[in-house]
Amino acid sequence: EFFGWRLAFFVVGVPGLLIALLFRFTVKEPIRGAAEGRVVSDDQPTVLETIKYLLNKKSFLHLAFGAALAAFVGYGLISWFPSFLQRSYGMQTGEIGTYLGLVLGIPGGIGIFFGGYIADYLGVKDSRWYLWTVAIAMLITAPLYASVYLSSTANMSFFWLIFAVGIGNFYQATSFSQTQGIVEIRMRSVAAAILLFIINIIGLGLGPQVVGILSDYLRPTYGNESLRYSLLILSTFKIWSAYHYYLAGKHLKNDLITN
C-alpha cells in the first residue's frame, strides 16, 4: 500500500544474493567430523538409506510430527492473520503489514535464539530436556494464541502475539539441532532436508487450507467472525505438538549418537 508490492521482493531478495556471494568467497568448507574428532567415510548414504535410518529413530518420528504441528499453527496464522485483522478490527493493509512484520520478525528471531539457549542449558544435564523444553513451550503457546484471537482490540491481539510468536518459535533451533545429533555425520544435510520437507508438507501445505475450510464451515453461524474461531481451533494443535515433543524427549537419550 505504501510502496507497491514489487518493492517487497527486492527488499527480501537482494540482501540474500549479496550475502550468498560474500559467504561463497569468505567461508572455507569445514572438514567433515572435525568438530567431533571423528574420521568420516567418503561414502555418501543415499536419500533412501537416510530415510530408513530416521524411521528407526523413535525420537525423530515424534520430533518431526511435533514440529510439523507447530508449523501447522504458525503457517495458518501467517496466511490468515491479515484477513482476521481486517475483518474483526477493521485494520488497513498498510498498517497490518507494518505491525505484523515487526511482531513476526523480532520476537520470532529472539524466540529461536532463546529456545536453543535454554535447551542447551538444561540438556547438558539430561538430554531429554532438549526436547522437553520445546514441549513446555508448545503448551504455553496454546493459551497465548487463544488470547490473540479472543482479544477485544487489535492492540491487545498484537500484544499477545508478541509472546505467542516468541515462545512458539522455541521449537525451530532445537528440532534441527537434535535431528543432527541422531544421525551419522554424512546424513546430516539430508536429514535436515527431510525434516524441513515434513514441516512444509504438513505446516505450509495443510495449515492455511484447514483454516479456510473451517472458516467457511463456521461462517453460517459466526458470519465475519468465523475466521476468528477457525484460528482459535487451530491453536489447540499446539497441545498435540507438545505431546509429541514430550515423547520425542523420552526416546532422545537412546537415539543420540555419542562420540
Regions found by a protein language model. Name each.
Residues 20-26, 142-150, 231-259:
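Multi-pass alpha-helical transporter architecture, strongest
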Residues 111-127, 215-216:
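Helix-to-loop junctions at the C-terminal end of transmembrane segments
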Residues 55-115, 167-176, 203-212:
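Extracytoplasmic gate region of multi-pass secondary transporters
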Residues 1-29:
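Helix-loop-helix hairpin linking two adjacent transmembrane segments in secondary transporters
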Residues 93-97, 185-195:
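Loop-to-transmembrane helix entry/capping segments in MFS-fold secondary transporters
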Residues 30-64, 88-91:
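Juxtamembrane intracellular "pre-TM" segments in multi-pass secondary transporters
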Residues 125-175:
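C-terminal transmembrane helical hairpin of 12-TM major facilitator-type secondary transporters
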Residues 123-125, 179-188:
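Paired intracellular helix-loop junctions of major facilitator superfamily
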